Amino acid sequence: MNAKAYFAQARSLPMQIQAKTKQLQAVRALQEPLAALPEASKTLSDLAADITAEVQAYAALQRQLQTLIDSLPVPEYRTLLELRYLSGSKWEEIAEAMSMHVRWVYRMHGRALQAAQKILDAAK
């Protein structure tokens, strides 16, 4: 997996967890009318287990990404990737926090991903 796809997981997993949580809330709202059906209880517990597993996977991914980010040689790369992928900041917020123009943040992001890719390749 390349560095860009690896980091992209950090932005997509929370959305998946949020979608499943909404689904769980919808099922819980229907739970009382469906209480007589044994399948409803099983569906609810299966959904809760799925959410728990995804939250655990997300936490593990966050730890892996933090380790990778910490190994980058340039402090600005570390800051940028932490803001983008661990804090979920938007490009404009990152540019403001780092006192840079957004276009420069995009360029630096590409360079940071290249540096991260070198570390990932060396670890193989």
Language-model features, listed with the residues they occupy:
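N-terminal interaction/assembly modules
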Residues: 1-71, 93, 114, 118-124
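Short, well-structured alpha-helical interface segments that form or flank functional binding sites
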Residues: 5, 89, 107
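N-terminal positioning helix adjacent to the helix-turn-helix/winged-helix DNA-binding module
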Residues: 61-64, 75-77, 108
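Short amphipathic alpha helix immediately N-terminal
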Residues: 72-89
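Helix-turn-helix DNA-binding module
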Residues: 87-103
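DNA-recognition helix of helix-turn-helix
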Residues: 99-119
